[in-house]
Amino acid sequence: MINKSYKHWMIVFFMCCLAASSIGLCTNAIGVFYTPVAKSLKVLKGTFAMHATLSTLATALTLLKISKVIKKYSYKKVLLIGVILSSGATWLMSYSTSVYLFYILGILRGIGVGIYGMVPITVVITNWFDKKHGLATSLALSFSGLSGAIFSPLLSSWITCYGWQMTYRFMAICILVLVLPALIVPWNIDPRKEHLLPYGYQNRKETTKVQNNKIKLLTISFLCMCLFTLLHTSITGISQHLSGVAVSIHLSVTIGATFMSFTMIGNISTKLLIGFLSDLLSPIKAVIMMILTNCF
């Protein structure tokens, strides 16, 4: 079986599209709606932004189970359900007149994002890549930042020209279109089912022996990792509010969207750099280097 082919990089392209749709559009770019929709519904921005919090919570709960689901069922069918939920919920938001309806639709969109977001993307790349795994992962996930950088000012401009209702419909169409390549082109989550091996895979003797099938979660290292993940992920939510911050200091919504684009550009460059360093050194060393860089 072949361990290097164009199909491996086609899979990366599909994952780029999924990241752009699920994380880029549904997570990184939604902040441009906070001010205009909250004003239209006559509620506080924080009250409206709660729908994004509920969406993220729904995504987190979905991610806990999705790895088992994609092993049991055809991922293309699962992917179709995910994109219908995310794009459909976004489309229905354009007709919403109550903040509570936004909460419900936000949860549905969050479930959809979880179905084809971060975990499925990394699972697919892990299955398809042995060597250059870090590069493939960072390349795919960087498109979440690229999508956010492109669509934040674009959505802001559409809101100004067409209103937030029509912009939600445009956004729903974009969410669906980005996923279409992965839905239309035949591919499998396991390369061996296509008579291929993971990229760069070589037969090697297994030297690691499993001592115990039980995994201990209540360890200091695991708890520290949970705390680190919580703290570093909480920072990403700030970018969604930059548009509202810009308006509060008498700048235009477009300027706020530009601020969001700059954060996404940093997102892209960091993911590409950490992917390169992971392959060159190791994932742990790469993360430590990036943390030290951020400290300065």
Question: Could you describe each region identified by the protein language model?
Answer:
Residues M10-F48, T62-I66, F151-S152, L231-G244:
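Extracytoplasmic
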Residues I107-S142:
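Cytoplasmic helix-loop-helix junction between adjacent transmembrane helices
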Residues T27-Y34, L217-I274:
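Extracytoplasmic gate region of multi-pass secondary transporters
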Residues A20, A89, Y100-Y116, L230:
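Hydrophobic core of transmembrane alpha-helices in multi-pass small-molecule transporters
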Residues T62-S74, T270-S282:
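Helix-to-loop junctions at the C-terminal end of transmembrane segments
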Residues W187-Q211:
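Flexible cytoplasmic inter-helical loops of multi-pass small-molecule transporters
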Residues K77-W91, K285-F296:
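Structural signature of the two symmetry-related core transmembrane helices
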Residues L139-P191:
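Helix-loop-helix hairpin linking two adjacent transmembrane segments in secondary transporters
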